[in-house]
């Protein structure tokens, strides 16, 4: 559990959900950290290299991502599902409503690390996973929310280590 020990864990499953339908967007104030801003810039640069549209920042998706990062850090688990076992899309839907929309879909990429991580590291890890790469390059996505949470002495799967948990939630509503 020494600080010098470097472990990077990446959930190899990137999920996508698409129940039809639903809600009016509004923009609660959310300030992005330097890491979160860098992840947004780098994802959009990657998408531009592949001739895909730039993702718009979504305060609602960012709030969903932060809530999940906090829950995983506090409860000591790492998964797309919520602590109660509910599907990730149901959690995201509480923040990024689907009502009043004909089409609604969300996806999510996660990672955690015991070392400082930058946006290049995050994208490199996600790029190595076919499921995560598909989320990064999904042409349907229009919006993104990002959370990079630093948790000291995180319990459970994190073994009491200081960790960084990064959650990106992707979405489209039309």
Explain the meaning of each model-derived region.
Residues 19-23:
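Sec/Tat signal peptide C-region and signal peptidase I cleavage site
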Residues 63-116:
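Short, surface-exposed glycine/acidic/tryptophan-bearing loops
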Residues 9-18:
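Bacterial N-terminal signal peptides
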Residues 49-64, 76-85, 100, 133-148:
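Surface-exposed patches in mature extracellular/periplasmic domains of secreted proteins
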Residues 112-174:
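Disulfide-stabilized extracellular recognition modules
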Residues 34, 52, 87, 105-107, ...:
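Extracytoplasmic
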Residues 1-8:
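Bacterial N-terminal signal peptides that target proteins for export
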Residues 27-75:
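A short alpha-helix/helix-coil micro-patch that ends at or immediately precedes a cysteine
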